[in-house]
Structures are given as structure tokens and as C-alpha cells.
């Protein structure tokens, strides 16, 4: 998007330390050239990348190398784009960074001439080489459409000039239009309404920066809210434009303010007398402009020019003489300096080569008395493809020049050496074809003579040097990785053809493995795979490495119990935009996070999103995410709040964890270190469940034939549910775990009736430890008595029948006690209900209730929050009690209305709860000074807990609103109800704490008779 800001200097071979990888020596260096004559030029160009290391190229050359060869080497490298057809439009500019002195370098100049003529004028480090588009075709708008790379490069060049020279001078309206056009072009995958989201706009401001699109002066003059609204409105106008349309719209808009296709020089025409004019040179020819109000007058067309000569005058001035066909004398132009005359001469000569029939240079050396420069060795006229082939062959022959600048990242002293000999690797069958070449199965013989099965990645012979660097980038990253769940690098063969040798895993890709074995793979194994990949990602997170392509296609199966993460080709070196352009099959849109699609931002948080999608793939046995959508529709679905549905076999707690990873705000997603802990817990739980199910299936009690008189089964006892773990778990706050039936109390040996606490004393039962929940009293085979005769079987059945009757009697007795306790609670909480009850339960009916007439009433769950009876006190003028009851009523209103209200009205019922909570806390604060100091700590702690409960309720409300139209809507509503219930229970606890303090302070009174 912009060029490199630092000076681009020419450095000697022995002093260069490239920031990223070795230089790309596209220019052929003869073997017999002395080392002192070899140069490395650092040439800057424009790019979309934010990485400064992507915006320049190091070119190795000699003092005899021509400028045209340097330009060609950059164009052939593919660094600025593929398939360049208008190569003659490019030129090389030498700029002095401190004085803005500019010299356009003629293609036939040599590096030695540039050094002797220009670089000696200033310090070497103050010069910079820039690749520029200087010569445009006549109808450049249409011509550039056929060469997309040149079109985008010219756009980047104009954008850079606009931001540096014109942005502060144009009107606010034009600056807003041009900035939004660049926004639309740069973030081409962003939906039209993306900037309407506050989080998206904040991400644009903080992570990308508005300075890249809009002038600072404009941002300072406008208020932030006003500026944001203007951007959103203007962006909507260009939301439907494609990239090329944005570029053309930018050209047309900027052309109304500045001349984008021509250069203007202030000079004098020598025609008997001197006339000061503005000389305009562009695709339409050489024209003069005497005033701003008049139209330019054509002086000459490029087809008419036959010679160009520069002559120095006194006092640093110079004369440019143009020989024009049919004219009696040459056109003489007087300039203020020789450098300006030479720049004009290069511009005119370039247009003559582009538009004229003569492809050589028309510039005549003053020192050679009319000898034209085209008598020098001609510029190679081969097309780019022939030139590409010629240079590739030359570079492969002289491959020893790579050794002159070692890559420090590939050779670290003391580290393992990854170079292997080609004769030690034997290739067998082809496993598949990658982006850069084929992948083979092979055998590697190490230095100990051991034979190791390996996979060998190869690079195509016709691959450009730039693509070879990208191919090698995977090995550069992998050689520094050491983790049991990351693919291991065996070695690298850097000589042509380049090979990367890695461990071979016989089970292949995880996606194919899941499809083949989906009938035999169990849930614990699938969770184990996810846990292992999560550990690998936590390792990458610790070394600040972003993978950017986490999917089952890039995971290999080492054994049925071990998987390994691979394919690090995109981890750091390949630019974001290149990955979008690779091919349809490699587009990762359906795995990407919203900020990666919208803004091309790849961070650890975006890797967390992709990892959750990968978990979804694993639990779906290799299905592609969003297979029912096209790539272009995915971001719209994500923006609406929709997420991937829960796979059929996915545990609910694991799916809840996935949804946390798919939070729209990257900062709210968990880190990989946290995910490892959560997945470890889930894996442990799923494994214990599987073990219990397998044990129950293996050891079943013997079937005993019962007599015909006892065919009717006894009533099924009630089943206490699994107690929730502490809410400090990361998986999902206040998540209602769904425990399989095998772990519930339906098995008689899980929790004996004697051990089951009644609702009255359950409050004093110590909490169950998380792992103790799964410790069942499993029945072993020797626990069963095998009857030896029919009579003995009948006796066993009678004993079992008596035991079952005792259990039922005990449970029915507990139900009577529960019913009495429940009525006492109702009387205390709402006296009106008890007064309106016209049919109280009589003792006679209670006695008759022991006869089983229907299914027993289930006692409260073990995990439920039981509420103790309210103290029997005089509630006259008790504001705390009154406010607690009002708050509970507000919570009940929320519970009853939530399913009927539209999402935008959730805030009304939640606000009602908040107002009542404020009244409650206010009444407690008024009473607090009269209570003992020893009781205040507990009361104040409960008040803080209530405030936290309200904040949690608000968060759940917002979550429910965001997911109102998604498949997560009902789950979010349940979480909202859970949060409101917790708030009501804590309010009751606050009332109990206040009552206890009032009793201690003798402020409580019994109720009046």
C-alpha cells in the first residue's frame, strides 16, 4: 500500500544483513568478476503489505550491469505481481532523501556510471532507488486494464503521491471519497455494512489506522463521532464496487485536481528570444502552457522526434535540444539545471521507445560528436517469458553466488544441521500434489544407517525464485519447532531441485482418516485429537508464531491416538493477499475470523477462531465448515451472529467452548493456554463416561425369571442430578452440564437411599468434589449371587422384593416431609397464597398419601441452590424484606415474559430488576450503621456479589440480543434466566444476613399473634 520509508542504499557484499531471507540474484554475475566490482542494490517498490520487509528487493549486480537489467530482474521475480505485459512503462529513480534531489536513470546507464556521476555527490546511505511507472500509453485507462499488475502498481504509486503531496490541499469531500475508495479496495472482502459495527470501526482505528486513508489535518478538524459518521455514509456509496472499479473511480476523481498522466517543467523556449512556459510532457506529446487559463499548445509528437541532446551552460543551467522531423532547426529548451534537462531527456526518450517505431535510445552523447547511444550494446529485446527462461538457466548455472551472503536464520551456530545429501533419500510413489510441487513417499538413511520413512516436498523446476523463497519459508519455520504434536523436519536439500524432507505418518491426513473411520471413532478420541492440536497451538502461541491455516487437511495422523499439526507455509512469510489469490481450493475464508476476512488481520486470536472451526471439523468427521455457503456469503452470516451448528456427537460443554472461541471481539476469545486446561477437563470427563458405559455394558446382572404374580415392575425411583462443578471453570460460566444417563442415580449402586440427603439437611452437606462425581460403586461380577435352583431363585426374588419395598417406603416418607417443608416455605414467602388456599392437606389425607397412586414427586436436585426458610420475624416497616420481595417479583416477571418479548425489549425487564436491586441496596445501607460491626463484612460482601450478579445478567442479556436470530438463541436465554435466578438467591441470602445481624443487635421482634 505504500513504499518503504527508510533510505534504500547500495551496500557491499560483506556488510549486508538482510532482515528476511537471502537476496534474489536475478542479474547474472560473471564468475571472473572481482569481488570489489560486485554490488547489491536495495530497490524499493510499492506493495499492499504492512511488512516493510516486503517492500524492497536486493539485486546483486556488477558495475557493468545496466539499469534495464535491474528493472527486468524485479519484474521477473514476481514480487510486484505476475504476468507483466507493459514492462516498458517502468523506470528507476534515484532520490536523495535529505534534499529531495531526483535523478531518473536511463535504462542504458550502468551501475558504475550511476556511482561515478550521482552517488559520489552525497553520502551513500542517503540515496534510495525507487521502481516507478513513468511512461504511460496514449489511452492508459484502457491499456492498463489488460495488465492488472501494472494497473495496481500505478494506483499504489498515485496513492502514495496523493497522500504526500495533495491530501492536505484537496477539499474534505474529495479526501473523504478518495479515502473510502481505498478502504473499499483494500478490504475488498468486507461487507457493505461492516463499518456500522462499532467494534469493526474501532479495530480499523486501532489496528490499521485511519492515517493510511485520510489526511491527518482532516481528522484533527472534525469531531470523532462526526468523522466516523461521514466515513460510514460515504463508504456505503462505494460498497458495491469491485477492486478495479475502485481504482478507476480513484483515477477519475484525482484527475479533477491533479495531472496524473503527465509531468510539468518550468523552463524557457529559445526562439530568438526566451519565452518562459510550462512544458507539459505526457502520452499526448510535448505541449506548452503559457497560462493556467489557456489550453496546452502541441509543440511535437514523439513519433516526430529524431534526436535528443543535453548541453550544459554557464551557472549550472543547461539546454535540451530536440531534433524534430521536418523542422528546419531543433527545438531548444533552457532549464535551470543539467539534472532537470537529463530528467526531461529520459522522459521524452522513454515515450519515444513506447510509442515510436524505433526501440533504441535517441539520446546523443555530447562528448562523441553525434554518435548515438544506440551504437552501444542494444537493450535486450527478448520478451519477458524468454528473458525469464534465460535468467533462470543462468542463475542455476552460477548457483555458487548464493554463498556470498549467508542467511543467518538458516545457519545458527550450535543448532541442529538440517542439510541432507540427496543420495541418502530414495523417492517412491507420489502421495499428492502441493501448491509448489509434488509430495513423494520416500526412505531416508541417516548417519547411523537407520532407514526412516519420510515425506518429501518438491518444488517445480519452472518455479520463480520468489516462489522458491516462499517454498523454503516453511522449512525455515519448522526447523525451529520442537513439539510432540507438530510435524518433525528431517532435513533440507537446497540445491536444485529443492526438497524438504519430513517425517512420514502412515495414516495420512486427519480429514480422510475421520471419514474412513467415523463408525469406529469415539467421542473421547475426537476430543483427544482436539486437545493435542490445542497443545501444539499453545506452543506456537508461546513463541509468537501465527499459523493462519488450522484445518484437518493440515493435520497428520501419526497413530490412532496421536495427531500432529503441519503445513507451516503460510505461517509468516507469505503475504495475506497472496493467500486469497492462490486458488479456489486453498481459500481459507470459511475458516477465517471476521477480522481476518474484513481487515486481513491475523493474530493469535484469529488462530483461536480457526482452531474452533477445526474442532468442529473433527467432531463432524471431516465435513467442511459452511459447506452450504459460498465463500462470499460467509462474512455476511458471521456478521449477523450465526455460527456453525453443534455436531451431533459433540458434547454440549465442548460446543459452548467453541462458541466462546467464535466471539466477534478478538479480545474476548480465550487463549490457547486456557483452552488446553478446558479441553483436558472435557477429555477427562468424556473418558470417564466412556469407561463407565463400557463397564456397565460388560457386567450386567443375571436375568432371574420372576413368577407370573410379580410381573408388574416397581415404580422408578427419582434420580438426583449431577452436581454442577464450581463456577471458576473456564468452559462456560453457570453452564448447565448435561450428564448422560449412565452417570445419573438411576443405577441403584450410584447413590444409596440412605446416603441421599433430604432437602432439609442438604444445605449442610459438603460440596461434592469434581472428580468424585464419577466414582461410582460399580458392581463387579463376584457381587452377584448365582442361584443354584429354582427355589433359591424364588427366595432371592422375595428378598429383593422386600428390599425394594423398604426403599419405596423410605422415599415416600421423605416426600411427605418435603411436602410439609414446601408448604412452610410458601407460607413464609407469600402469606396471601396460603390464605387463599381453600383445601389444605388434612392429616387424614396425609396418612392416606402413603398409598402409592402415581409417580413420586422428585425431590430437589443435589446441584440446585436450596433456599432456607426466612426467619419468622415481625416484618412491619421492614424495608429490606419488602425490597427483597419486590426484587424477586421482578425476577419472576423477567422469567415469565422473556420468551414472549422481542430482543430489543429485554432491556426493559432487566432494567426493572436493576432498579429494584438499587432500592434494596439503598435500604440495607440505611440500616447498616445500626448493625454490629462484626456483621457488616458479610453484608457488604453480599452487596458486592449482587452487583456482580447484575453485571452478569446484563452481559447475558446482550449475548441473547446478539444471537437472537441464531441457533444459539435458546441457549443464551437459558443463561440469562440462570443469571437472574442467581441474583434472586443472593438477594435472599442478603435478607438472611441482615436478619441475623438484627437478632444480634436486638432489633428483631417476633411476629404479633
Swiss-Prot record:
Domain FERM stretches: 39-359
Region of interest called Disordered, as start-end residue ranges on this chain: 702-725
Database matches in Pfam families: FERM_C_FAK1, FERM_M, FERM_N_2, Focal_AT, PK_Tyr_Ser-Thr
Expression sites (tissue/organ): Highly expressed in pulmonary vein endothelial cells, lung and brain (at protein level). Isoform 1 is expressed at high levels in the brain (hippocampus, cerebral cortex and olfactory bulb) and poorly in the spleen and other tissues, whereas isoforms 2 and 3 are expressed in the spleen and brain (highest in cerebellum).
GO terms of molecular function: 3-phosphoinositide-dependent protein kinase binding; ATP binding; calcium/calmodulin-dependent protein kinase activity; enzyme binding; glutamate receptor binding; ionotropic glutamate receptor binding; neurotransmitter receptor regulator activity; non-membrane spanning protein tyrosine kinase activity
Activity regulation description: Activated in response to stimuli that lead to increased intracellular Ca(2+) levels; this activation is indirect and may be mediated by calcium-mediated production of reactive oxygen species (ROS). Activated by autophosphorylation at Tyr-402; this creates a binding site for SRC family kinases and leads to phosphorylation at additional tyrosine residues. Phosphorylation at Tyr-402, Tyr-579 and Tyr-580 is required for optimal kinase activity.
Region (Focal adhesion targeting (FAT)) residue spans: 868-1009
Binding site for ATP: 431-439, 457, 503-509
Keyword NAD belongs to the record: no
Phosphoserine modification, residue list: 361, 375, 399, 762, 839, 866
InterPro entries: Band_41_domain, FADK_N, FAK1-like_FERM_C, FAK1/PYK2_FERM_C, FERM/acyl-CoA-bd_prot_sf, FERM_2, FERM_central, FERM_domain
Subunit structure: Homodimer, or homooligomer. Interacts with NPHP1, ASAP1, ASAP2, ARHGAP26, SKAP2 and TGFB1I1. The Tyr-402 phosphorylated form interacts with SRC (via SH2 domain) and SRC family members. Forms a signaling complex with EPHA1, LCK and phosphatidylinositol 3-kinase; upon activation by EFNA1. Interacts with GRB2 (via SH2 domain). Interacts with P53/TP53 and MDM2. Interacts with MYLK. Interacts with BCAR1. Interacts with RB1CC1. Interacts with RHOU. Interacts with VAV1. Interacts with PDPK1. Interacts with LPXN and PTPN12. Interacts with SIRPA and SH2D3C. Interacts (hypophosphorylated) with PXN.
Record PTM: Phosphorylated on tyrosine residues in response to various stimuli that elevate the intracellular calcium concentration; this activation is indirect and may be mediated by production of reactive oxygen species (ROS). Tyr-402 is the major autophosphorylation site, but other kinases can also phosphorylate Tyr-402. Autophosphorylation occurs in trans, i.e. one subunit of the dimeric receptor phosphorylates tyrosine residues on the other subunit. Phosphorylation at Tyr-402 promotes interaction with SRC and SRC family members, leading to phosphorylation at Tyr-579; Tyr-580 and Tyr-881.
Catalytic reaction annotation: L-tyrosyl-[protein] + ATP = O-phospho-L-tyrosyl-[protein] + ADP + H(+)
Family (UniProt): Belongs to the protein kinase superfamily. Tyr protein kinase family. FAK subfamily.
SMART domains, alphabetized: B41, TyrKc
Enzyme Commission code: 2.7.10.2
Protein name: Protein-tyrosine kinase 2-beta
Catalytic site positions: 549 (proton acceptor)
Amino acid at each position: 500500500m505504500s513504499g518503504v520509508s527508510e533510505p534504500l542504499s547500495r551496500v557491499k557484499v560483506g556488510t549486508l544483513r538482510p532482515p528476511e531471507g537471502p537476496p534474489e540474484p536475478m542479474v547474472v554475475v560473471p564468475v571472473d568478476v572481482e569481488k570489489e566490482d560486485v554490488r547489491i542494490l536495495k530497490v524499493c517498490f510499492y506493495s499492499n503489505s504492512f511488512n516493510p520487509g516486503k517492500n524492497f528487493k536486493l539485486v546483486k549486480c556488477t558495475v557493468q550491469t545496466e539499469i534495464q537489467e535491474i528493472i527486468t530482474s524485479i519484474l521477473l521475480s514476481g514480487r510486484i505481481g505476475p504476468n507483466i505485459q507493459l514492462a516498458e512503462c517502468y523506470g528507476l529513480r534515484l532520490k536523495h532523501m535529505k534534499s529531495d534531489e531526483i535523478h531518473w536513470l536511463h535504462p542504458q546507464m550502468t551501475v558504475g556510471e550511476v556511482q561515478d556521476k550521482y552517488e559520489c555527490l552525497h553520502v551513500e546511505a542517503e540515496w534510495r532507488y525507487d521502481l516507478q511507472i513513468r511512461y504511460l500509453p496514449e489511452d492508459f485507462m484502457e491499456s492498463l486494464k489488460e495488465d492488472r499488475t501494472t494497473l495496481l502498481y500505478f494506483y499504489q504509486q498515485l496513492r502514495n503521491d496523493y497522500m504526500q503531496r495533495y491530501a492536505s490541499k484537496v477539499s474534505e469531500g474529495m479526501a473523504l471519497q478518495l479515502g473510502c475508495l481505498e478502504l473499499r479496495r483494500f478490504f475488498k472482502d468486507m461487507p457493505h455494512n461492516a463499518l456500522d459495527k462499532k467494534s469493526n470501526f474501532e479495530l480499523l482505528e486501532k489496528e490499521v489506522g485511519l492515517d493510511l486513508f485520510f489526511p491527518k489535518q482532516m481528522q484533527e478538524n472534525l469531531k470523532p463521532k462526526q468523522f466516523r459518521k461521514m466515513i460510514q455514509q460515504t463508504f456505503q456509496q462505494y460498497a458495491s464496487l469491485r477492486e478495479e472499479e475502485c481504482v478507476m473511480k480513484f483515477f477519475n476523481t484525482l484527475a479533477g485536481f491533479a495531472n496524473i498522466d503527465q509531468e510539468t517543467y518550468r523552463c524557457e523556449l529559445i526562439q530568438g528570444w526566451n519565452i518562459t512556459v510550462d512544458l507539459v510532457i505526457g502520452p499526448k506529446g510535448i505541449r506548452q502552457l503559457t497560462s493556467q487559463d489557456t489550453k496546452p499548445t502541441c509543440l511535437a509528437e514523439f513519433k516526430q522526434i529524431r534526436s535528443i541532446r543535453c548541453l550544459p551552460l554557464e551557472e549550472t543551467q543547461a539546454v535540451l535540444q530536440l531534433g524534430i522531423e521536418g523542422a528546419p532547426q531543433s527545438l531548444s529548451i533552457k532549464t535551470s539545471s543539467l539534472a532537470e534537462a537529463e530528467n526531461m531527456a529520459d522522459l521524452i526518450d522513454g515515450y519515444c521507445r513506447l510509442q515510436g517505431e524505433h526501440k533504441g535510445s535517441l539520446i546523443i552523447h555530447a562528448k562523441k560528436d553525434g554518435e548515438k547511444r544506440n551504437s552501444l550494446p542494444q537493450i535486450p529485446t527478448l520478451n519477458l517469458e524468454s528473458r525469464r527462461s534465460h535468467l533462470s538457466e543462468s542463475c542455476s548455472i552460477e548457483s555458487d553466488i548464493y554463498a556470498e551472503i549467508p542467511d543467518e536464520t538458516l545457519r545458527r551456530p550450535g543448532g541442529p544441521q538440517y542439510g541432507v545429501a540427496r543420495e541418502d533419500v530414495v523417492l517412491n510413489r507420489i502421495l499428492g500434489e502441493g501448491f509448489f510441487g509434488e509430495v513423494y513417499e520416500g526412505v531416508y538413511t541417516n548417519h547411523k544407517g537407520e532407514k526412516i520413512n519420510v515425506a518429501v516436498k518438491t518444488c517445480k523446476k519452472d518455479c520463480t525464485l520468489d516462489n522458491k523463497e516462499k517454498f523454503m519459508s516453511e522449512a525455515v519455520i519448522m526447523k525451529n519447532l520442537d513439539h510432540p504434536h507438530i510435524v518433525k523436519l528431517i532435513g533440507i536439500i537446497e540445491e536444485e531441485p529443492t526438497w524438504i524432507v519430513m517425517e512420514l505418518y502412515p495414516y495420512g491426513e486427519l480429514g480422510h482418516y475421520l471419514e474412513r473411520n467415523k463408525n469406529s471413532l469415539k467421542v473421547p478420541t475426537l476430543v483427544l485429537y482436539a486437545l493435542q492440536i490445542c497443545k501444539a497451538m499453545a506452543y506456537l502461541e508461546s513463541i509468537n508464531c501465527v499459523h493462519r491455516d488450522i484445518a484437518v487437511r493440515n493435520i497428520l495422523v501419526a497413530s490412532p491416538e496421536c495427531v500432529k499439526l503441519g503445513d507451516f507455509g503460510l505461517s509468516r512469510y507469505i503475504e495475506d493477499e497472496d493467500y486469497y489469490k492462490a486458488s479456489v481450493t486453498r481459500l481459507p475464508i470459511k475458516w477465517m475470523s471476521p477480522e481476518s476476512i474484513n481487515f486481513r488481520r491475523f493474530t493469535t486470536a484469529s488462530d483461536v477462531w480457526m482452531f474452533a472451526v477445526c474442532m468442529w471439523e473433527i467432531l463432524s468427521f471431516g465435513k467442511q465448515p459452511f459447506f452450504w455457503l459460498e465463500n462470499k456469503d460467509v462474512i455476511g452470516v458471521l456478521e449477523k451472529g450465526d455460527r456453525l451448528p453443534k455436531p451431533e456427537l459433540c458434547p454440549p460443554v465442548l460446543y459452548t467452548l467453541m462458541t466462546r472461541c467464535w466471539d466477534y471481539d478478538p479480545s474476548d476469545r480465550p487463549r490457547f493456554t486456557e483452552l488446553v486446561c478446558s479441553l483436558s477437563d472435557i477429555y477427562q470427563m468424556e473418558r470417564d463416561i466412556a469407561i463407565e458405559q463400557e463397564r456397565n455394558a460388560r457386567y450386567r446382572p443375571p436375568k432371574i425369571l420372576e413368577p407370573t404374580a410379580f410381573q408388574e415392575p416397581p415404580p422408578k425411583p427419582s434420580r438426583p442430578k449431577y452436581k454442577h462443578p464450581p463456577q471458576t471453570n473456564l468452559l462456560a460460566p453457570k453452564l448447565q452440564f448435561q450428564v448422560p444417563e449412565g452417570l445419573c442415580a438411576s443405577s441403584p449402586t450410584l447413590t444409596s437411599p440412605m446416603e441421599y440427603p433430604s432437602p432439609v439437611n442438604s444445605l449442610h452437606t459438603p460440596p461434592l468434589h469434581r472428580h468424585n462425581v464419577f466414582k461410582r460403586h460399580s458392581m463387579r461380577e463376584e457381587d452377584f449371587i448365582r442361584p443354584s435352583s429354582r427355589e433359591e431363585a424364588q427366595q432371592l426374588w422375595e428378598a429383593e422384593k422386600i428390599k425394594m419395598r423398604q426403599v419405596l417406603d423410605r422415599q415416600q416418607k421423605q416426600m411427605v416431609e418435603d411436602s410439609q417443608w414446601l408448604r412452610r416455605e410458601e407460607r413464609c414467602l407469600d402469606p396471601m397464597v396460603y390464605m387463599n388456599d381453600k383445601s389444605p392437606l388434612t392429616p387424614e389425607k396425609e396418612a392416606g398419601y402413603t398409598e402409592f397412586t402415581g409417580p413420586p414427586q422428585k425431590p430437589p436436585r443435589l446441584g440446585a441452590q436450596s433456599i432456607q426458610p426466612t426467619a419468622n420475624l415481625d416484618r412491619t416497616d421492614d424495608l429490606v424484606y419488602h425490597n427483597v420481595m419486590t426484587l424477586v417479583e421482578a425476577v419472576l416477571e423477567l422469567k415469565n415474559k422473556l420468551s414472549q418479548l422481542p430482543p430489543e425489549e429485554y432491556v426493559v425487564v432487566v432494567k426493572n430488576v436493576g432498579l429494584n436491586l438499587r432500592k434494596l441496596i439503598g435500604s440495607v445501607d440505611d440500616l447498616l450503621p445500626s448493625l454490629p460491626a462484626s456483621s457488616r463484612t458479610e453484608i457488604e460482601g453480599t452487596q458486592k456479589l449482587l452487583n456482580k450478579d447484575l453485571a452478569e445478567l446484563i452481559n447475558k442479556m446482550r449475548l441473547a440480543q446478539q444471537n437472537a436470530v441464531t441457533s444459539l438463541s435458546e441457549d443464551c436465554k437459558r443463561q440469562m434466566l440462570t443469571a437472574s435466578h442467581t441474583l434472586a438467591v443472593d438477594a435472599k441470602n442478603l435478607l438472611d444476613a441482615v436478619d441475623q445481624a438484627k437478632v444480634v443487635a436486638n432489633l428483631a421482634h417476633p411476629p404479633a399473634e
